[in-house]
Amino acid sequence: MSHHSSGLRSSISSTSYRRTFGPPPSLSPGAFSYSSSSRFSSSRLLGSGSPSSSARLGSFRAPRAGALRLPSERLDFSMAEALNQEFLATRSNEKQELQELNDRFANFIEKVRFLEQQNAALRGELSQARGQEPARADQLCQQELRELRRELELLGRERDRVQVERDGLAEDLGALKQRLEEETRKREDAEHNLVLFRKDVDDATLSRLELERKIESLMDEIEFLKKLHEEELRDLQVSVESQQVQQVEVEATVKPELTAALRDIRAQYENIAAKNLQEAEEWYKSKYADLSDAANRNHEALRQAKQEMNESRRQIQSLTCEVDGLRGTNEALLRQLRELEEQFALEAGGYQAGAARLEEELRQLKEEMARHLREYQELLNVKMALDIEIATYRKLLEGEESRISVPVHSFASLSLKTTVPEVEPPQDSHSRKMVLIRTIETRDGEKVVTESQKEQHSELDKSSIHSY
């Protein structure tokens, strides 16, 4: 009896379900019953933890009361009660664990269905984003880039035109600077000539003043000579008159000789006086003519110098005005060039900022797309992990169902104490088992549960009754 009970205990505790999940399997209560007709029966929960799917494992009929009407036979109720309690505890634990596993499996199924729905929604959003948003964003970016390139080309052409104008203005400015330098040099030459002319004018003025002083001195000298000549003439006249008087006086004595002598002397003095007067007049006239010519030349030179000075002054004024105008034009052109360069720099900075902003938006879109792809990949990985876990649970459940579907042999035999040497052998008994097969499938994100029942008959092992 103890041998059979230990074999039953070892057969119950060494199931594949306990080896897979750790704790002992759970069984439903009410497994054993012992009737008044000495019949022992057992049942076990099969399938997915449903208490309705039970099968009778077997029944042992004790010898009839008429056949075993011996006063000394009795049953070992204590061993049967211990086996019954152990089987009940094991079955209740197995039922509880199967219920927990079913709940966990249902949670996993719900989670998988939720994740599949999210995956389908994200896949739809991703396909929509791939089909619309990137193309539209790419189209908008390409359009913006084309517009920016066109504006950059226009700005480049405008910049080239401005550079050509700047080069032309620089050439004109160089020519104007060269002309300004030439005019400045001419002005300096004119000023130098003006200084020289002023010096010449001053020299001519000094010469004129000197000549005027000389003329005055000569006029004074001429007046003095005239006076001296008049005095000499008067003296000569006086002397002539005195000589005439003397001649008249002498004529009386020496009239013929004195008259001739006086006539000769008078003729000589008259000739000398006429000659001196003529020479003085000629010298005066020549000096006057020379001084007049010199004065005229000096006046002409002074007039020419003044005219040239006025002309140089007018040229200097016109060149100064022209230089001022050119300077104003140059400053205006330089200011316009700086304004154009600043405007071009601002526009180029704005376009570069716009291009950078579009590139940043494109980069953000790419990063968002990459993030969606990573999330999608993570969801795919989670789905694959859940599929693998579901497949593992499915394999475990299929293995457990296949293990449960194997015919269950009898796990206990009753020992009767008797003094009769021969005991009627027990009749062969058959067990009937109802197997409940539950199949859980996931189709298009929905859980499909199918159940089927199968009735099996299996022959129980024959157990011998040992007597003491």
Curated annotation (Swiss-Prot):
> IF rod domain spans which residues?
94-404
Q: Which organism is it from?
A: Rattus norvegicus (Rat)
Q: What Pfam families would the database entry show? A: Filament, Filament_head
Q: Cite a GO CC annotation.
A: perikaryon
Q: Where is this region: Coil 1B?
A: 141-236
Entries under PANTHER family matching the protein: GLIAL FIBRILLARY ACIDIC PROTEIN, PERIPHERIN
Region spans: Tail: 403-468
Recorded name of the encoding gene: Prph
Q: What is its main location?
A: cytoplasm
What's the protein name? Peripherin
Q: Which residues carry this modification: 3'-nitrotyrosine?
A: 17, 376
Q: Which residues carry this modification: Phosphoserine?
A: 28, 50, 59
Question: What does the annotation say about its assembly with partners?
Answer: Forms homodimers (in vitro). Homopolymerizes into a filamentous network (in vitro). Forms heterodimers with NEFL, NEFM or NEFH (in vitro). Interacts with DST (via C-terminus). Interacts with RAB7A; the interaction is direct. Interacts with PRKCE (via phorbol-ester/DAG-type 2 domain).
Q: Which GO terms describe its biological process?
A: intermediate filament cytoskeleton organization; intermediate filament organization
Question: What InterPro entries does UniProt report for this protein, alphabetically?
Answer: IF_conserved (IPR018039), IF_rod_dom (IPR039008), Intermed_filament_DNA-bd (IPR006821), Intermediate_filament (IPR050405), Keratin_I (IPR002957)
Name any one GO molecular function.
structural constituent of cytoskeleton
Which segments carry the region annotation Coil 1A? Answer: 97-129
